[in-house]
Amino acid sequence: MSLLGSISLTSGRTLAVVAVLAVLSLLAGAFLLPRWTPRHFPRRTRHWLGRAVLILVPILLVTATGALILNRSLGLVKTSGDLAALIASNVDEPAAESGGEVTISDQPIASSSLDATFTRTEDGMLTTTWTGPISGITLPVFVIAPRDYSPTDGKTYAVIELLHGYPGEADGTTQGAHVQEALDNAIDAGIIPPTIIVVPSLSVDEEAHDCADIEDRPAVYTWSAHEIPAFVRHNFPNTSDKRDAWMLGGFSAGAYCAVWTAMRTPQTFGAAASLSGYDTQIEGQMTNLGDQYLADNTLSTMLAKRVPDGLRIYAMAAADDGAGGAPAAVKMAKAVKFPDTVTTDIPPTGGHAGPLWREHIPTMLAWWCSSDKVANALGSSPTAATARASEAYASIVPATNVTHTVRPTAPNGLVSLAVLALLSAAFVTLTWRFAGTWSAVLAGDADASASRSRFFRLPMPRVIAELPRPVASCVTYAARLACLSVVALACAAFIGVCANMAGGFYTSWSSVAESFMEGLR
């Protein structure tokens, strides 16, 4: 990977460098604005170009700073190379229909091929880079174990496998969702029995990841449904091999894959959790297998057609999720046949973002063990009563119908967009036409007459002109700096709202603020 392509977009150092550059661009811009006068640059083209640079550079750097902060909250894009690949994948021509889904027969896995050596990350997760013996996929795998875990502690552990979304990565998603904290708290409170969480990477290339084994593509289904469970049982031998002690969950695109995979692999998974998932796949190569394939692999259709075997599904999505997560949950609940069950959890707000998932990880854990199926599979003490009495379980908002609405003043609302557009236009105009005149000049100075030219309309106010020159210089510099700062912040917010409306992530300003605080940690 080239040097430019290897720049980390999640490190505090990168954020600090860009933030410092943004501040310096504001300071320099405020200093140079009055020096871009017609006297210095009488030709209009040079004057306009210089003034545009002084305004655009701070806007771009402040926007980049905000984007880096939000990206750090979930680690969605790791490096500049990943960002370039993500952009390229979204502008390329749509792929043609591929050869279709393939079935890889069960193959014996040699015990030695399951061996792994783990290291511990800064936040306490165990990690290794491992190669699936059947799929050939080589990717990082992260394991979150309880704080007192030991393979010789005499306990039998349940297992939760979590699948990240796209864009995104295993470690960033789990760190941003505070999964380790939620796991330890739930175990300490007796809400769930001892449990290990495994989070495999699904990023086999720069494309959106798949759920299925597709011809001429890496065998992601084999990796997540067969190899990862075998990997866990081998390296953590005190984990249960019983279906009811295993749950497969996911976020966004990973949520669709979690429910899809759990239905395809009933011998392994007795429960599934969908956090802001879809009913029909909208990403990856599965979308190129034809309309009939997509219809057959719609989750509500699969639930209606499958032979029910007691699969339990937790389907959470905010009612204002623009990606359709809430309608997907309701459709699954209406299609399910007993003894399969679907529990819907539809909070009124939350969008399709990290703060919502962070809030509902404890809810997912409480729901999972609100049935004693898990405890019975482990032979441990019952948890259902404790789980059902918990605040997390009480927060579930069941729904049978949902209506998607967008608040006009939300980060994805038209009023917010219009206000920021007007604010940006007003302050860009103010900075472009007037801020350059806010400087302390002596009577008869050539700049004084130039400041009254077509492009610099306002002379220095009398109240400032009467101040001592050093004080007046500081006051006018502060005014230019404030004006340019407002321009940069307003335009950055406008760009952010446009991107948010396209992506459908945030639906409340509080969730934006929460992600900012998370990204600054």
Predicted features along the sequence, with ranges:
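Non-catalytic cap/lid and distal C-terminal segments of serine-dependent acyl enzymes
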Residues: M1-A448, R452-R521
